[in-house]
Each structure stands twice: as C-alpha cells, then as structure tokens.
Amino acid sequence: MRVVLIDGEHYPDVTKWAIHKLGDVCCAVFLGGTEKIGSLKALEDKIGVPLYHSPNYLDALKRAVLENDVEEVVDLSDEPVLTYEDRFRIASLCMLLGVTYRGADFTFTPKPLKKTKKPSISIIGTGKRVGKTAVSGFVARTLKEVARPVVVTMGRGGPEEPELIEGEKIELTPQFLLKVAKEGKHAASDHFEDALTSRVTTIGCRRCGGGMAGFPFFDVVDKGVELAESLPHDLIILEGSGATFPAYRTDAYILIIGGRQKTDFLRGYFGPFRIALADLIIVTMSDEINPEKRAEIRKIVEEINPKADLHFTAFRPRPLGNISGKKLGLVMTSQSALPKAKEHLEGLGAEVVATSGNLSNRPKLREDLEKFRGIDAVAVELKAAAVDVVTKWALERGIEVIYLDNEPVNIDGKDLRKSVLELGKRVLGRRA
C-alpha cells in the first residue's frame, strides 16, 4: 500500500486524478498550502482516501505509516510547500520507518535491517574522522565490566573474508603489526585498533561504497556477524565506517558526532535519521568548539530525539606504554589536536620534542619523520600510515614505538562510562 503526500497548492481535482493514476493508495498526508482548497474535510471527501494532518507534518506521516500497511510514501507535493530540506527530513523518517520514499525524479529505498541472534549495539558516526573507533574501543573495554563483547568492524581497507583477532589472548606488538602490513594487509584497520586498545576479540570486515542514508553498497558484515554469533561472547558491538554502518536493527545505537562538523549535516540531509536512531549520542572534540555551537548541537538533538542521552566530550591521548622520562616524537592525524595532546603527554612525564599532524598524508608524513631528531620513542595513533610508515621507520632506526589511544572524557559534568554501562545492562536485560 501507498501513502501520498499532498498540498493545497494543487487543485483537489488534480490531486484526485493523480491518486487514481497511482493506484493502491490507502491514505494521504496533508503538508500545507491553502491557495487552491477549501476545508480539509472537503479535500478529504474529494480525494476519496483518509487524510492525515498535523501542525507537524512528520507526526502526521509517522501516524499514517504506522497505522496502515504502508510500503511506499509517494510525494505528490512541490515547492513552495516542500523545500529540499523538508524532503530530506521526510526521507530520514522513511528510512527510520523502513519504507520507500519516492518522488517524480528520486527514490530513497531503505535496506532491510536484520536482527542479530545475540544482544547487540551499533556504534555509528556522522562522518569520517569523528573519533568513532576511539569511542568504540572505550565502549568495548567499559562493557567488559558487565559482558564479554566481540566487536565486528567494517572498513574500506578491511579483509575480503572476516578476520578474527583474539585481542583477549594475543599481544599486538609493533613488530607483529608490521609483519601484518608486510603481508599486504591494512594493519591499522579498526579491528586491529580495537583489539590493541581494549584487549577484546574483534572481527574485521570489508565494505565498499556508502549511500546517502549510510548503507554500504557491498560488504561482508553478514559473515562477520555469523562468526561473532558462533563465539562464546555474549554481546556484539557493530562498528560503522565513516558515515556508513551495517544494515542491522540492533538493540541500541550509539551515535558519534564530530564537534567540528557543520551543523547542516546534523539538521539536514540524513543527519536526522542517524540522530533519531540513537540511544546515546557522544559529541567528540567538543573542547575545540565554542559554547554557542555546543548549544546549537544540543538544540538540534533535542528537537529530533529528546530522549537521547547526550554527552559532550574531549579526547585525551592514552599511551599504551610507559612514556615517563622519554623524549617523544608525536604523530597524529589532526594538526589541530597536537597542542593539547602534547600538553597532556608532557603532564604524564614525557618531553615531546617533535610533532607531525600528517598521519593521513604519507608523502608529508615521510618528510616530517626525516626531521625528527633526538627522540627515544615515537607516540602514534594506530590509524592510516601508523604501521606501514611510522612503525617501519622507527623500528629500522631502533626507536621504540608507543601506540596512542584517544579516550573520550566528559567536559559537560556527565559520566560517559556510567551511561555506557547502563546502556549495556539494558541491552543484555532485554534479551535475558
């Protein structure tokens, strides 16, 4: 069955004609506009199907879809009643409800969302470089207090077949990771990073392409989930890639928003879809934005999903080795993050004597490394070229490699660790 979106800028006879040509229409949603209609009751009588309306057209559309056996929403409206922004809001709601949204020259079709056999949590993002893997590692090691999690990742450099890393059992040394890189694998993939930083079992999967709503074009996550369900672990964490995430209806969703992202990407496009999914929302790098932008992000979230638990956080580097008394070369993906990271590491007893923010730019990174002098160790995030360039460079020169985790720390007075534990307990309790 179909629901149609209509407005008062079309004559009722024209709307009735279009509904008849479409066929299989169960109801209509009135979006606004009064130029060519009388009362809504008269419009309903004219078009011959039940008419839903509300001051908020999204509320009316949601009721229409939930109260009827709707598979498709067909847009028979137009400007000025509907703007491009409105249409993306409608598309986001349709993705959330699992129905197709079709207009004269566009179609948005949701992927069928599968269910995991075991309790599960999705960690998704609003884009790349928002700190999703760092947060995923934090979530995984936090949930070890109440569960035995396994993390299933998807990435553009992931393996063709799911790759199991038993992070609970093996130690991921720089030498081991370099050996993996020399075998032609992406040793800084998310499943290696999660296993290294959190000592949990991980499963790495490949994906290619990402749609506007966040679904991958190709991936092998189904095989990864099947492997995860065969293990003795009792909680599956599905980690997205960039703005793309596995097509699973998990028991809970954690959304990562980068504080430096444009707010247009949150209130527009498919930002509302991701926000509406979330039980817990973590804004990272909040210390790099002003209070006005934090307030704007809060307002957007509260308008779309007021029930979500919202946290504003900053990243603090957590060295996975002893740095006290050592002269460090510091290598990160973000140039802007270097000053605070340097200050934090020096507060732990190190002396940072050289830095590079070009971890994701191999040619510039190699130039930076050649300028490093007088260091005992190199501290590097496990991302991008951390293994095949930085680790290789350091080990060839007898320089110690210390990998860095980025740990989210609240700057809003809330307790993210407590919220993650509560969410994990709720998810486990639902399947008990």
UniProtKB/Swiss-Prot annotation:
Highest taxon, organism lineage: Archaea
Cellular compartment(s): Cytoplasm
Gene Ontology BP terms: gluconeogenesis
Catalytic activity: (2R)-2,3-bisphosphoglycerate + ATP + H(+) = cyclic (2R)-2,3-bisphosphoglycerate + ADP + phosphate
Keywords: ATP-binding, Cytoplasm, Ligase, Nucleotide-binding
UniProt-recorded Gene Ontology molecular function terms: ATP binding; cyclic 2,3-diphosphoglycerate synthetase activity; ligase activity
Classification via InterPro entries: Cyc_diphosphoglycerate_synth (IPR016557)
Enzyme class label: ligase
Key word Cytoplasm present: yes
Key word Cytoplasm present: yes
A GO CC term attached to the entry: cytoplasm
Primary location recorded for the protein, binned into one broad class: cytoplasm
Record-listed E.C. numbers: 6.5.1.9
Disulfide bonds: none
Entries under HAMAP family matching the protein: Cyc_PG_syn
Annotated function: Catalyzes the formation of cyclic 2,3-diphosphoglycerate (cDPG) by formation of an intramolecular phosphoanhydride bond at the expense of ATP.
Family: Belongs to the cyclic 2,3-diphosphoglycerate synthetase family.
Protein name per UniProt: Cyclic 2,3-diphosphoglycerate synthetase
Record organism: Thermococcus kodakarensis (strain ATCC BAA-918 / JCM 12380 / KOD1) (Pyrococcus kodakaraensis (strain KOD1))
Gene name of the record: cpgS
